[in-house]
Regions:
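Conserved N-terminal phosphate-binding loop of PLP-dependent enzymes in the Aspartate aminotransferase
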Residues: 1-152
């Protein structure tokens, strides 16, 4: 959970150095839970590919997405007869209800500034939990970002 601020930027640097794509799985960390819109961005990292789901519709309807950087998008545009479309899904795999739910959730996340609220509430909760490290022998440490906290 708490990786230290330099860890993720160092991973980004290594990926860039060796030409490796950095893929961020934001299924759990996306849409504000970590105190930033996406966990990777909260660590100061811009991945090449992001995948997310669940929180995109607040769990009401199944929906997931894969987001690509401009370089990868350009590769599809340059090498595809379908004008850059990613022909990897099927019509029965997505539907207007899920997309409408996703748009509604994104509106609420933005309007209510949920990432900033998660950061604020998480800071408070972390402060309340930190004394557990010295109070309970079974708690080694308390760590995390935003509302993604752990007692380890």
């Amino acid at each position: 959970m708490s990786l230290g601020y330099n860890f993720c930027p160092l991973v980004r640097e290594i990926c860039d150095k060796y030409g490796v794509l950095l893929i961020a799985d934001e299924v759990v960390t996306g849409f504000g839970r970590s105190g930033a819109m996406f966990g990777s961005r909260g660590w100061g990292v811009k991945p090449d590919i992001m995948v997310f789901a669940k929180a995109l519709t607040a769990g009401y309807v199944p929906l997931s997405a894969t987001v690509l950087n401009q370089r990868i998008e350009a590769a599809y545009l340059d090498n595809c007869d379908a004008r850059g479309l990613l022909m990897t899904g099927f019509t029965y795999g997505g539907h207007p209800l899920a997309c409408a739910a996703g748009m509604a959730v994104l509106d609420i996340v933005e309007q209510e500034n949920l990432p900033a609220n998660a950061a604020l509430q998480g800071e408070y909760l972390l402060g309340q939990l930190l004394p557990f490290e010295s109070r309970f022998r079974s708690v080694g440490n308390v760590r995390g970002k935003g509302l993604m906290l752990a007692l380890v």
